[in-house]
Amino acid sequence: MGYERLGPSGATGSVTTSTTTAPILNQVSTSEQPENNNRRSKKKLVVSSIVLAISLILAAAIFAGVRSRLKLNQSVPGLARKPSQAISKACELTRFPELCVDSLMDFPGSLAASSSKDLIHVTVNMTLHHFSHALYSSASLSFVDMPPRARSAYDSCVELLDDSVDALSRALSSVVSSSAKPQDVTTWLSAALTNHDTCTEGFDGVDDGGVKDHMTAALQNLSELVSNCLAIFSASHDGDDFAGVPIQNRRLLGVEEREEKFPRWMRPKEREILEMPVSQIQADIIVSKDGNGTCKTISEAIKKAPQNSTRRIIIYVKAGRYEENNLKVGRKKINLMFVGDGKGKTVISGGKSIFDNITTFHTASFAATGAGFIARDITFENWAGPAKHQAVALRIGADHAVIYRCNIIGYQDTLYVHSNRQFFRECDIYGTVDFIFGNAAVVLQNCSIYARKPMDFQKNTITAQNRKDPNQNTGISIHASRVLAASDLQATNGSTQTYLGRPWKLFSRTVYMMSYIGGHVHTRGWLEWNTTFALDTLYYGEYLNSGPGSGLGQRVSWPGYRVINSTAEANRFTVAEFIYGSSWLPSTGVSFLAGLSI
């Protein structure tokens, strides 16, 4: 199966892509535009340094409060190099206990912590310091000449480390707050771990030893440190959660098992905007190719949008085909809402793939990481084609993101649900291999999922979920949707095998609930990644599905696969419980089913 993505970390016999590594050049990767690259590099270094300084100031301030509260006295002679009972007990619950003990013993404040709840402050603070150091160390490479593939991996890493420092800073602020929400902390820690994985995976196949070796050293143990944070935090809030493979979200009080037109927490004015005809919407920015708007391009509109806005900024993109390649709503562009003229009318398109010597992360035609992102009535497309392998149409890493009434069209790796909490409603998603993939906590509801005709000898796999740690609150929940064959796949008369998903990482988690599954889906339902990898640690579930492909009699018999028979278990993957849709603080909502009922 040479068409596959890179194999899972730590797996033997993993499959690699057929992409050839770019030759090492004695020039910067974007030699066609050296001045732009130098500006970008200098800007990246300055931004990274500023982010690091702010993060360290925040961590120091918060840590000072923790120090005062715990009455730290790290210098007690009898305690030197001997872990406290709290450290020993907490680290026993982690997946990396030796690193847990050693790292905490070397960090101020740990020995004075008397419980796991006290220790979590120190643990997150320590992890934040390590990520901040990695970001600072990485920034020193900004001016180094790199071949294109190494430059893409490096740029991805710097961005992801920056996002992780922000996520860990928010987690640290939250754990010292009396009003902390456990689901927020778990989400941000999960995102930091996912960011690290994406960063390291970007260097797979990179032959630039100097850059790769430097980054490998800078990133050492970061994944394990976040994993330990997740374990200690989970145990400090609910010890029972850690005992099972899936840590499921707790049921929210007051959430009814019925359809709500809009979330209760959504502002009345914004509720109207989501359903309001375009002609009645007062947009802050209008994009029109003919010049009859605020901007002619989407990239210009994104630049014009304010940073860290406390209100919804509406960008209306008029009908037309916008091919600007690698558009991105950055982390500081929060609360942006993109409104188009409808599926197939407003089209955001691109054709980047890994064959352009860039990471999968950078192939996205459109990407959004700013919290509270909403897109409505737009088509996102990557036209690179099946022969170009990984080619993302839409990548979402924004927390509390909503994609409503959109088309997402591609082949391999069409939709990258990268991280944080996401909700898709009434979307049409087209692809072939692993075309819904990533490690967000995401619910797709009332969506149509179309498998297309792949290349010869390829198999279609709808999902490739990459949950790496049992304490991450991530997974893909497909609820009240339709799994269908596109017209080109129908024409093959069943010669192409299509599967519901396969495990990209060890604790991969995907469920299909109350959905229609077409006859093109193989009777086994699910496909191995390779041999027996993750078959006993994954969580794949099916609940009350219908259609000719929903039969359970010949499904796989893996230890991690289950037919869900309990309503309580199925409820764990609903909007209300899996992504806490009814409690999101930013106003980023859409009509949805809170529970299971249709």
Curated annotation (Swiss-Prot):
What keyword terms does UniProt attach to this protein?
Answer: Aspartyl esterase, Cell wall biogenesis/degradation, Disulfide bond, Hydrolase, Membrane, Transmembrane, Transmembrane helix
Membrane topology, from the record? Single-pass membrane protein
Q: Where is the active site?
A: D413, D434
Which CDD domains did the record assign?
PMEI-like_3 (cd15798)
Q: Compositionally biased, Polar residues: which spans?
A: 24-36
**Assigned EC number:** 3.1.1.11
The main location is membrane
- Other noteworthy facts: The PMEI region may act as an autoinhibitory domain and prevent untimely PME activity during transport.
Name recorded for this polypeptide: Probable pectinesterase/pectinesterase inhibitor 34
